[in-house]
């Protein structure tokens, strides 16, 4: 509640600075607050308030680089505070509402292909640094799993994910990645049927982008078909994309173990499918 109140207070400053009028109830996400607003010219927009951290830093830069191509359009931004003024989309109609998961995957993949066609600008966090950090943390995580009941299988799975990641880590790529593109981060829009929101900018290989869309709606199955559809739509080498996706499972698993949690059952299922188990 303290963070929420602080962000709302910041919002008052930017309502005044950018000549905005609030016209609805604030929407609160995991790390941000969004105010529906109207600009002085009558244009409807969204004021996004958040703290700057390693995931949100550079969001304005990424949106400016994409220039609204397949993604929400940036109208104003303040890099110091991470505050963004964005075009208004229909928050009540996420891509997750499309009943056919394969159709939703096709739409997401086509948007992702547009985003990852763009080279990352200078100043965006790079995948090679992320991967190096993962390998630095891996030994301690593996050691923490030693001797735990039922953890030997988890340990082997992480070792296999790490082995796959090592095969591609030498070519980390240079595309501008979203890093968190799943069906809830695509909203219906007016100028296009669907637009992407909430990037966590990263420069790297598009194969590192696929896991969120496999994990989201995991229970609806068809994971192999969804993986193939995404790799085909993006024009990715399937084996490299497989390795990067296993690397993404490794990344999320490292975080979970370090927080004292077990591996995510659904991500384990995705990894086993990609490993042919």
Segments and roles (model prediction):
Residues 1-71, 189-193, 261, 270-277:
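Conserved NTP-binding catalytic cores of kinases and kinase-like/nucleotidyltransferase enzymes
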Residues 6-11, 15, 117-178, 189, ...:
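An alpha-helical support segment within catalytic cores of ATP-dependent transferases
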Residues 244-245, 249:
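Short alpha-helical scaffolding segments that buttress acidic/His motifs in well-ordered protein cores
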């Amino acid at each position: 509640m303290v963070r929420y109140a602080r962000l709302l207070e910041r919002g008052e400053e930017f309502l005044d600075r950018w000549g905005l009028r609030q016209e609805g109830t604030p929407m609160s996400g995991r790390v941000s607050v969004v105010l529906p607003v109207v600009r002085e010219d009558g244009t409807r927009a969204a004021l996004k308030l958040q703290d700057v951290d390693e995931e949100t830093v550079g969001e304005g830069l990424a949106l400016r680089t994409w220039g609204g191509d397949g993604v929400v359009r940036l109208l104003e931004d303040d890099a110091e505070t991470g505050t963004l003024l964005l075009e208004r989309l229909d928050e009540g109609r996420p891509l997750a509402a499309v009943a056919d998961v394969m159709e939703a995957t096709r739409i997401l993949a086509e948007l992702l292909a547009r985003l990852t066609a763009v080279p990352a600008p200078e100043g965006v966090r790079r995948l090679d640094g992320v991967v190096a950090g993962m390998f630095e943390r891996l030994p301690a995580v593996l050691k923490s799993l030693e001797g735990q009941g039922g953890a030997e299988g988890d340990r082997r799975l992480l070792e296999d994910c790490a082995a796959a990641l090592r095969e591609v880590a030498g070519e980390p790529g240079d595309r501008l990645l979203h890093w968190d593109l799943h069906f809830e981060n695509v909203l219906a829009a007016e100028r296009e049927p669907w637009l992407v929101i909430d990037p966590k900018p990263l420069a790297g290989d598009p194969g590192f982008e696929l896991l969120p869309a496999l994990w989201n709606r995991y229970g609806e199955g068809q994971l192999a078909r969804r993986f193939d559809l995404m790799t085909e739509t993006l024009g990715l080498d399937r084996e490299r994309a497989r390795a990067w996706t296993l690397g993404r499972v490794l990344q999320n698993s490292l975080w979970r173990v370090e927080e004292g949690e077990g591996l995510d059952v659904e991500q384990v299922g995705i990894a086993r499918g990609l490993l042919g188990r």
